[in-house]
Amino acid sequence: MLNNAMSVVILAAGKGTRMYSDLPKVLHTLAGKAMVQHVIDAANELGAAHVHLVYGHGGDLLKQALKDDNLNWVLQAEQLGTGHAMQQAAPFFADDEDILMLYGDVPLISVETLQRLRDAKPQGGIGLLTVKLDDPTGYGRITRENGKVTGIVEHKDATDEQRQIQEINTGILIANGADMKRWLAKLTNNNAQGEYYITDIIALAYQEGREIVAVHPQRLSEVEGVNNRLQLSRLERVYQSEQAEKLLLAGVMLRDPARFDLRGTLTHGRDVEIDTNVIIEGNVTLGNRVKIGTGCVIKNSVIGDDCEISPYTVVEDANLAAACTIGPFARLRPGAELLEGAHVGNFVEMKKARLGKGSKAGHLTYLGDAEIGDNVNIGAGTITCNYDGANKFKTIIGDDVFVGSDTQLVAPVTVGKGATIAAGTTVTRNVGENALAISRVPQTQKEGWRRPVKKK
């Protein structure tokens, strides 16, 4: 069906006392992203014309965390219920648009479910998201007559008979803007909590002869809210299990799906293998036949075909061409780039550095602000000294250079093609092509020398 224009209201004013945190509840993260950000993203994907965020506690923290989102900030100075929260946003509703109500602490609601709810909303009526629970204790019950929804009764206000109802309200609903404003103006706080319930608009709509259509989510986890860290951790595992299942069905071999975390977006080729306890953050692309060892963290990086990343390696904002090998225990920091067939071994760190085709840095090395050519050997213990305490400087190493172990290259410095740097050398001046650079202290040997003896 053809949908009206739609705006979304996200309720995010709660303090989250049971989180025992100085951070507003909705800013606690699930899969590396604030819970409320999941909801904002869903609203935007659904095509919301406006997103109204109702906030209360921790407003400054919320505005700082969500500064890049195009939000209309609506203050709820007193937390007097969900109906009161919606009343604060009501002046911003257009009469001819639909208003979808969501919650900042219900992070896993899917766009697919919301679209079905939107499509199901009857003209002049309400679309309501409900679920059936074996134990509905504590939740508002859906009342019906002859199968038609007539209202919602909160648990504290329900009779014993009503408490036997298993269909409960999720709090998510959609209605026309003009209707919503009219119903919100009629709300009272005559209930056990002394609050203004948004759920009372269901009975108001029914009294006007309006139709209320109930829709069920695809998964219960979509409508589960978070009030404490235990609930958040459970939803985290639900989310991660769903992501792992999608990847497995798409051909990615996860050695143990229960020990894999996706905290962003993973684009992948064929025959990718990921071992246990791997974390993927941000936007990551893995080419064909990539292998990632246990304990690795990959963030905002592109890994080319046939690359192998050995255990306990951290890769962040890096680009690897085909057939590179890294680790174990290596660290590629932002700006690291490996060309085809390059190798970075254990305890090697790279930052804003390029390692050319077939070049190798096998172990115990720091390469920062460096441009390294093809077929270069970087010996163990090599350090590019790129920082003078105030500014960073660049090291340039040409093709086919051999850098011996325990070498320091004091930037800015250039080493020409084919040069050799002897082990233990401190390079402070440019080295010409095919030259040998050596700066060792001359070795002294004392024959018959005896070690000191400790005095008694």
Swiss-Prot record:
What positions does the entry give for acetyl-CoA binding? 380, 386-387, 405, 423, 440
Task: Mention any one GO cellular component term assigned to this protein in its UniProt record.
Answer: cytoplasm
What Pfam families would the database entry show? Hexapep, NTP_transf_3
- The enzyme's E.C. designation: 2.7.7.23, 2.3.1.157
Q: Where in the cell is it found?
A: Cytoplasm
Annotated residues that bind UDP-N-acetyl-alpha-D-glucosamine are located at 11-14, 25, 76, 81-82, 103-105, 140, 154, 169, 227, 333, 351, 366, 377
Return the protein name: Bifunctional protein GlmU
Question: What subunit structure does UniProt give?
Answer: Homotrimer.
Main location per the UniProt record: cytoplasm
GO biological process terms, alphabetically, are:
cell morphogenesis; cell wall organization; lipid A biosynthetic process; peptidoglycan biosynthetic process; regulation of cell shape; UDP-N-acetylglucosamine biosynthetic process
Source species of the chain: Escherichia coli O81 (strain ED1a)
Residues at which Mg(2+) binds:
105, 227
Q: Where is this region: Linker?
A: 230-250
| Role, per record | Catalyzes the last two sequential reactions in the de novo biosynthetic pathway for UDP-N-acetylglucosamine (UDP-GlcNAc). The C-terminal domain catalyzes the transfer of acetyl group from acetyl coenzyme A to glucosamine-1-phosphate (GlcN-1-P) to produce N-acetylglucosamine-1-phosphate (GlcNAc-1-P), which is converted into UDP-GlcNAc by the transfer of uridine 5-monophosphate (from uridine 5-triphosphate), a reaction catalyzed by the N-terminal domain.
Stretches the record annotates as Pyrophosphorylase? 1-229
Catalysed reaction(s)?
alpha-D-glucosamine 1-phosphate + acetyl-CoA = N-acetyl-alpha-D-glucosamine 1-phosphate + CoA + H(+); N-acetyl-alpha-D-glucosamine 1-phosphate + UTP + H(+) = UDP-N-acetyl-alpha-D-glucosamine + diphosphate
- What superkingdom heads the lineage? Bacteria
Q: Which CDD domains match?
A: GT2_GlmU_N_bac, LbH_GlmU_C
Free-text comment on the cofactor: Binds 1 Mg(2+) ion per subunit.
Here the disulfide bonds are: none
Which Gene3D superfamilies would you find in this protein's record?
A: Hexapeptide repeat proteins (2.160.10.10), Spore Coat Polysaccharide Biosynthesis Protein SpsA, Chain A (3.90.550.10)
Required cofactor(s): Mg(2+)
Name the catalytic site residues: 363 (proton acceptor)
